[in-house]
């Protein structure tokens, strides 16, 4: 159970950072915020997401925080930590929301002052829209919360991350290594976004919206995308993503070959396999 006397700081009040701030405040924790945009900071203040916040001269907020949530892109988090990481006080445990861990966790842990611990985690939730104004619309309950400990993490920090996830409302919490996380995310998240984006880029017919049905809308929902964030995540995990794209391309080529050969049996076989795997997936979805 989380200690409600501890002070929380959210650095980066975007969609997920804003949601963390909102849920922690609703649960009775003291939450401060740091954000580059004055407008988004004011929104968080006016709507009660945070108790106080700053866009600059925020060293006092950093040094007084018991726990910090970084809602920053990986590159920005590393740059921020190089500048301000020395301000974190001993005993501070902090986490992130980044969708990629390789290249992030090791350098940040190496920069941690004595007694400070980076417990990396990934809330697999979001929306097509970004910014703190949409944070309240995010639903953590059906989403996965992935904790990625290393040998530098203590049992106390791992338990803190689990307790944090429960307070935030996640119903499914799991633990993976950094490498396992990035390989898995390359398939279940990044490949899906790559397919949706490619589908939208494959046809420039401006009249498509007049004829599409639910299948097209469902498949391309995530194609409305934060270009800067996803470009960074794709490039940071490019080896895993390229591997998954190659496997997907091989499966698509099998279907193409079946069409060229008028191979009805092969098509039906692929459809049955897809149906079976989707049914098994549905049974395992968190409620």
Could you say what each language-model-derived stretch is?
Residues 1-63, 67:
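NAD(P)+-binding Rossmann beta1-loop-alpha1 motif at the extreme N-terminus of oxidoreductases
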Residues 207-277:
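Interdomain hinge/lid region at the active-site interface
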